[in-house]
Amino acid sequence: MSNSIAVIKIGGNVIDDNVKLTAFLQDFSKLKGPKILVHGGGKKSSQFSKEIGLTPTMHQGRRITDAATLDVVTMVYAGLINKNIVAQLQSLGCNALGMSGADGNAIQSVKRNHPEIDFGFVGDVEKVNTDFIQTQLSQGITPVFCAITHNKKGQLLNTNADTIASEVAASLSNAFEVVLHYCFEKKGVLQSVEDD
């Protein structure tokens, strides 16, 4: 196994555009060596929420996740989006395995405890199961993580995909030279979204 690894996170600008997603996955599948893909949910979860009569609620760009919203984001992120990405990667010869953080106890989180806002079922990453991930990588499998984690007490949690990517990358840094890439619509890492 190579001593370097790419961890790449894609956001809504890629996920919501089939042409961009296909082009990205073609390039991603050609990357040599071990790699991990992390994805968010784009606009699809908000779209599905509205279709079933739920109004998405955001606070500073973060989704407030009540029980009904958690059901939707789990279905969309871990189901529809994740499995479509995995199927496309398989068609390109990339042996991808789609997962949430609950699968293989890959990523554990704690429910966000904010002093002013109740984010509901939103998680902050607490632990990454590096052994499990390295086992997948050693078998030639490319993990594809969605933005759902768990608390190891039976509760799924909606978790920021950017954070998942950075925590997975950091957890692997003792075993690999990690290169972390974020593919998003902003011009770079900004101190404020108004700086764009």
Model-found features: residue ranges?
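Nucleotide/pyrophosphate-binding catalytic subdomain
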Residues: 1-196
